[in-house]
């Protein structure tokens, strides 16, 4: 089940992003001289993951369950191993970063807990970073206005139960009135409540 969870064929490869990163370091503007120098010395990256909770909910896995813990460990160990392999290969090709000379690494830092909630919204409303969704329904305020956000995985569960449009509207209002919680809903099983 967890073995085939993520397509990892593209992880760890050398890409145009590394070339672009090097180009920006070399062309650092005068106002950024110290930052450019620091970046050149350590060549830190911030590889992270997003959509962790969305992934779990899409597969019907509770965030605090044993499957989530196992997948979390396995997925992030895989990311770390691929990032470490890639930085070592880059050190062979392009040389080590000056701050880590003798360690066979091109980059001092590889991983970061990122991105944030704004990135999650931009990426089709996925969950931010490795964090859980803050609620199943809430009002999102932006410069262009406010709109209600509904958990798309929970909405799918409701639709599979064959609810009518009016029933769905009432349920979403009820969820919004309970700060996005579904723990009070009798239509959901205990297992579904654990997921959402």
Predicted regions and their residues:
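Long, C-terminal-biased catalytic regions of enzyme "large/alpha" subunits
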Residues: 1-196
């Amino acid at each position: 089940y967890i073995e085939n969870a993520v397509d990892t064929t593209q992880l760890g490869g050398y890409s145009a992003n590394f070339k672009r990163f090097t180009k920006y370091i070399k062309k650092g503007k005068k106002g950024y001289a110290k930052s450019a120098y620091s970046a050149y010395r350590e060549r830190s990256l911030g590889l992270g993951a997003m959509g962790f909770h969305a992934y779990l909910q899409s597969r019907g896995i509770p965030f605090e369950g044993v499957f989530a813990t196992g997948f979390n460990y396995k997925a992030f160990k895989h990311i770390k191993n691929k990032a470490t392999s890639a930085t070592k290969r880059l050190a062979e090709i392009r040389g080590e970063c000056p701050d880590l000379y003798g360690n066979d690494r091109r980059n001092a830092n590889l991983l970061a807990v990122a991105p944030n909630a704004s990135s999650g919204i931009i990426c089709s409303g996925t969950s931010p970073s490795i964090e859980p969704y803050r609620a199943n329904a809430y009002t999102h305020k932006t410069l262009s206005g406010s709109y209600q956000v509904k958990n798309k995985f929970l909405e799918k569960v409701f639709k599979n139960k064959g609810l009518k449009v009016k029933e769905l509207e009432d349920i979403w209002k009820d969820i919004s009135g309970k700060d996005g919680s579904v723990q009070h809903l009798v239509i959901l099983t205990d297992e579904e409540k654990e997921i959402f």
